[in-house]
């Protein structure tokens, strides 16, 4: 059994076919082996989603199909990204700011050395996070205690969450491509954006949708894991404290937790306990203001004096105006 596993791992020729060049610090075969393992996990989950998709088309509810779509997309994006990552593709070389990670023999002669930066993982996060945020919103809206959901509030909150999350992903990407200390400016901006975004998520989930129980625990765990991405970035692309292999293991574990385990849980929760809420444009969680009770003042109108009723066939007789009577007397 061990010989078979060893033989299988020895078939990994990614670094031989796509060798890192012009780099002092890059992933090794051990790092690539780990990335292929994560790739296989996402591939297995992807196949499960494909089978579930065909089952849901025939026997599943609409909510199951709605939840299955973002979960499938997340897994597909990560499957694609880890194939690229494990194949030693989708990277560029950037000189490190600090000389914490050293090599016995420098290839480039630069001090600090040139570090391998995988921009492909940022692209995968950019594509996956909006789908995950939509799935979180869907699960909270369909499994919570609220039966009436404001569509405008939902779109407003979800838009802020998506834009804020994409902003911190782009901030970390730009910061990783800068060799000077200015990279930490982008890191700080991204961290502030993530803090504001998580504030919006908490307000929406815990106060508006009233997410409780194990769903709330899973959401809080996911929000804590997000900050581990920033810690990993500071140790790898930012601070050059850990080797690229350690970075690959760190990010691989985080991605498995956020983009593999959590979407599976949300999909199961929606399929088991979800119910379609009523959507309205004004209902739900709109705040009450005192001015809402003040009705617009209606313009004053002069009441019309009703004409006296007359019998059928009776000719209406109009009395002459006083001015007309005076004119007739003067003429006489």
From Swiss-Prot:
Keywords, comma-separated and alphabetical: Membrane, Phosphoprotein, Stress response, Transmembrane, Transmembrane helix
SMART domains in the record: Bac_rhodopsin
Location of this chain's protein in the cell: Membrane
Topological domain ranges for the Extracellular compartment: 1-34, 87-121, 179-181, 237-248
SUPFAM superfamilies: Family A G protein-coupled receptor-like (SSF81321)
CDD domains membership: 7tm_YRO2_fungal-like
Topology class, membrane: Multi-pass membrane protein
Main location, first listed in the record: membrane
UniProt modified residues of type Phosphothreonine: 331
UniProt xrefs under Gene3D superfamilies: Rhodopsin 7-helix transmembrane proteins
Ranges that cross the membrane: 35-55, 66-86, 122-142, 158-178, 182-202, 216-236, 249-269
Leader peptide range in chain numbering: none
Pfam families hit by this protein: Bac_rhodopsin
Modified residues (Phosphoserine): 308
Residue intervals on the Cytoplasmic side: 56-65, 143-157, 203-215, 270-332
Annotated S-S bridges: none
Additional free-text comment from the UniProt record: Present with 7800 molecules/cell in log phase SD medium.
Family named by the database record: Belongs to the archaeal/bacterial/fungal opsin family.
Protein name: 30 kDa heat shock protein
